[in-house]
Amino acid sequence: MPLLTQQIQDEDDQYSLVASLDNVRNLSTILKAIHFREHATCFATKNGIKVTVENAKCVQANAFIQAGIFQEFKVQEESVTFRINLTVLLDCLSIFGSSPMPGTLTALRMCYQGYGYPLMLFLEEGGVVTVCKINTQEPEETLDFDFCSTNVINKIILQSEGLREAFSELDMTSEVLQITMSPDKPYFRLSTFGNAGSSHLDYPKDSDLMEAFHCNQTQVNRYKISLLKPSTKALVLSCKVSIRTDNRGFLSLQYMIRNEDGQICFVEYYCCPDEEVPESES
């Protein structure tokens, strides 16, 4: 990235965060997977960047971009946090077009000086450099879903194609998606209760799509479909998905996404259960 490197290398010390990518799509694609609200909170540490989006204190999405994804990654402080308009950020990241010509890459250098300063984006394609300044905001406290691995009751790992098919067939007239996880039959079941009646989709634990099955007790929980719907953006991009429920019925959907360079990033959705399940419908 010669132009960008020469232009700003000397100024690095004034920034609390500097991150460079040879291919901006390795960032923008992951951010699109959690873009269901306008604003996001960004957390940067030496391990990478976490971008968090929340809705109605019931659902939270986190995109993790590890430091190793970047060609250059520097964080001067222990942690750097700011809130940003995610819609504007994505518009800037695709300023040269969202689907460039084959073989053409847009390079990115992202710099943040600290509290009260804008996020600076330097984008370069074919020798042309565009500079964007995006105002940052006071970071709001994000929800702590307290989803601890020691409290996980049930966990399965599925190839994403199996869940993509299921989600495309869900009855969207149903307000809720009921998830049953059990050490015994039906093992893993997705149920909806729509205008046409109830429908169930079962996955045997020995299915070719099932990569891991660790269910300790039967759990039946309901989640608002409207809250789960945004997670299908991540599902479409992912190759595997880990589905976990804890002792409170909270749901974790962790999507493994491979970028254009074959590197792995993760997007995680947390969702709280909707209600107690009526005995007659379970």
UniProtKB/Swiss-Prot annotation:
It is found in: Nucleus. Component of the 9-1-1 cell-cycle checkpoint response complex that plays a major role in DNA repair. The 9-1-1 complex is recruited to DNA lesion upon damage by the RAD17-replication factor C (RFC) clamp loader complex. Acts then as a sliding clamp platform on DNA for several proteins involved in long-patch base excision repair (LP-BER). Keywords: DNA damage, DNA repair, Nucleus. This is Cell cycle checkpoint protein RAD1. One of its GO terms (biological process) is substantia nigra development. It comes from Homo sapiens. Changing residue 254 to A: Reduced binding to RHNO1. Belongs to the rad1 family. Expressed in testis, uterus, bladder, spleen, ovaries, lung, brain and muscle (at protein level). GO terms for cellular component: checkpoint clamp complex; chromosome; intracellular membrane-bounded organelle; nucleoplasm. GO terms for molecular function: damaged DNA binding; double-stranded DNA 3'-5' DNA exonuclease activity. The gene is RAD1. Component of the toroidal 9-1-1 (RAD9-RAD1-HUS1) complex, composed of RAD9A, RAD1 and HUS1. The 9-1-1 complex associates with LIG1, POLB, FEN1, RAD17, HDAC1, RPA1 and RPA2. The 9-1-1 complex associates with the RAD17-RFC complex. RAD1 interacts with POLB, FEN1, HUS1, HUS1B, RAD9A and RAD9B. Interacts with DNAJC7. Interacts with RHNO1; interaction is direct. InterPro entries: Cell_cycle_checkpoint_Rad1, DNA_clamp_sf, Rad1_Rec1_Rad17. It comes from the Eukaryota. The keyword Transmembrane helix does not apply. Its main location: nucleus. The keyword Transcription does not apply.
